[in-house]
């Protein structure tokens, strides 16, 4: 029996691939870390239905080997997803300093090793179904992201062209570095300064009504949705499998949350876009900022 679902976990050394595999193991996936390339057939022959396989730069000599591995699995017809784990260079530097472990590329400096690996793995990042930046993500939030992604994939059409992650954030806490497209909605009047709305958030009807009724909001959204309905098919044509759209306001509680939820719903129901998988996250809520 062929495996029902194989998840390939790859990415930058020190970014958290082992943590990712541990989370998937807790989600009932049988995990294999650092699988040598060339054992593709054994993955397909096993009767295990849910497999998560860790592959990193130690495993392959060049990205061509990785793509050969991936294409072999794809051609078998087995359902497969690629999750790419990354983090900011400063975070990876700090993690290596604490662990006192050597980077697998062993360049003159640790930073050079990190930057070289980032460059080598860029083509793999581009075809990933899910890209996660662990710079500011706690393990609990990482688990939530995985669950959202996998639950969405379980009910999807097998002809899905692209996975679209739409996230809200607050600029006061820093910008999300995994963004492909970023929109700043701080030009819209802030509900935070209205006493009865201050403690509410973008899920509350009063906040949604206030934000979306603003003249600036209407004009912005009138342009935003058609722009994305144009851009997304272009990304699909270029072979992009994952797109992260970030919308930010001051605290990531009112305006950005409202727009993310509305945009996600409208993209799902778009008559222009077909076979897309849309899922949402609200960074500041997940980090406990509201």
UniProtKB/Swiss-Prot annotation:
Q: Which Pfam families match?
A: PapZ_C, RapZ-like_N
Mind telling me which InterPro entries this protein's record contains?
P-loop_NTPase, RapZ-like, RapZ-like_N, RapZ_C
Q: What are the alphabetically sorted keywords of the record?
A: ATP-binding, GTP-binding, Nucleotide-binding
| A Gene Ontology molecular function term of the record | GTP binding
Residues bound to GTP are 56-59
Look up keyword Nucleotide-binding and say if it applies.
yes
**Can you tell me which residues bind ATP?**
11-18
Its biological purpose is as follows: Displays ATPase and GTPase activities.
The entry sums up its family as follows:
Belongs to the RapZ-like family.
Name of the protein in its database record: Nucleotide-binding protein FN1089
């Amino acid at each position: 029996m062929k495996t029902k679902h194989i998840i390939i976990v790859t990415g930058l050394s020190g970014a958290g691939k082992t943590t990712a595999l541990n989370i998937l193991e807790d989600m009932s996936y049988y995990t294999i870390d650092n699988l040598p390339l060339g054992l593709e057939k054994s993955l397909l022959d096993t009767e295990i239905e849910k497999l998560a396989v860790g592959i990193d730069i130690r495993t392959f000599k060049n990205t061509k080997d990785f793509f050969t591995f991936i294409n072999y699995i794809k051609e078998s017809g087995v359902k497969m997803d690629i999750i790419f784990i990354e983090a900011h260079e400063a975070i990876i530097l700090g993690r290596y300093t604490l662990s006192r472990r050597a980077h697998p590329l062993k360049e003159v400096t640790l930073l050079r090793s990190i930057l070289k690996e980032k460059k080598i793995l860029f083509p793999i990042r581009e075809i990933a179904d899910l890209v996660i930046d662990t710079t500011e993500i706690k393990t609990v939030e990482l688990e939530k992201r995985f669950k959202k992604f996998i639950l969405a994939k379980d009910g999807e059409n097998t002809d899905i062209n692209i996975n679209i992650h739409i996230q809200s954030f607050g600029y006061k806490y820093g910008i999300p570095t995994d963004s492909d497209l970023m929109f700043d909605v701080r030009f819209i009047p802030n509900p935070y300064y209205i006493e009865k709305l201050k403690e509410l958030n973008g899920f509350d009807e009063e906040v949604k009504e206030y934000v979306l009724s603003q003249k600036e909001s209407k004009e912005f959204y009138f342009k935003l949705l058609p722009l994305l309905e144009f851009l997304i098919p272009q990304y699909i044509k270029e072979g992009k499998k994952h797109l992260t759209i970030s919308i930010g306001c001051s605290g990531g509680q009112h305006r950005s949350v409202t727009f993310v939820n509305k945009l996600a719903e409208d993209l799902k129901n778009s008559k222009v876009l077909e076979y897309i998988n849309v899922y949402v996250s609200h960074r500041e809520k997940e980090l406990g900022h509201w």
